[in-house]
């Protein structure tokens, strides 16, 4: 994820519908292609079973079928992610990746925010608002109150410092300082 990452309003029902379709489609594609490709590998390169004999040792061919199926799924994802129908699912996926990058540096960002470091405050503002967005989309009602509490605490800190902070100012490059 590079460049500017803005928080976007997402149609929850559309996102969930397309996300479910993508997940089910990928699992089904992976399962079906794994079996088909594994069987094709065994047919062309495998050891033929003898009546009453032990296993043929074609595990490596089945495994190769799974790897090939996984490669097909990755190819599909890479080509479909830019399609308008998949925009929201891909956006949320990128947002979750970015949240993970921020989370790995969260302690040092929070320390800098206590010293009113403006970039740290912008990062935290983006982080908590993006968490609230994703939790809402994923129906994660258990932890959204914690995120809202963190947002409230952050806003009080920003107000006390007399600083103006907007989550839209966030860029992933800001993380390099932490």
Task: Name each model-derived stretch.
Residues 118-125, 144-152:
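Short, charged, amphipathic alpha-helical segments
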Residues 41-59:
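Membrane-interfacial hairpin junctions
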Residues 25-45:
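Canonical alpha-helical transmembrane segments of integral membrane proteins
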Residues 103-137:
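Acidic, Ser/Thr-rich low-complexity segments on the non-lumenal side of membrane proteins
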Residues 2-22:
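Cytosolic juxtamembrane N-terminal segments of multi-pass membrane proteins
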Residues 145-178:
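Cytosol-/stroma-facing membrane-proximal "stalk/adaptor" domains immediately downstream
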Residues 91-107:
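Membrane-cytosol interface motif
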Residues 65-84:
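Transmembrane alpha-helices and immediately adjacent membrane-cytoplasm interface residues
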């Amino acid at each position: 994820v590079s460049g500017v990452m803005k928080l976007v309003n997402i149609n929850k029902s559309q996102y969930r519908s397309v996300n479910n379709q993508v997940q089910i489609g990928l699992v089904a594609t992976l399962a079906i292609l794994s079996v088909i490709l594994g069987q094709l590998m065994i047919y062309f390169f495998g050891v033929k079973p003898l009546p009453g004999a032990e296993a043929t040792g074609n595990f490596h061919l089945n495994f190769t079928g799974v790897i090939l199926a996984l490669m097909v799924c990755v190819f599909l994802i890479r080509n479909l992610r830019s399609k308008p129908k998949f925009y929201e699912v891909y956006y949320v996926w990128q947002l979750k990746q970015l949240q993970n990058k921020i989370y790995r540096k969260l302690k040092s960002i929070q320390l800098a925010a206590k010293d009113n470091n403006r970039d740290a405050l912008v990062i935290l503002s983006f982080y908590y608002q993006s968490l609230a967005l994703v939790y809402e989309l994923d129906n994660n009602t258990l932890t959204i109150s914690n995120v809202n509490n963190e947002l409230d605490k952050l806003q009080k800190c920003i107000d006390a410092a007399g600083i103006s902070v907007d989550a839209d100012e966030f860029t992933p490059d800001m993380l390099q300082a932490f």
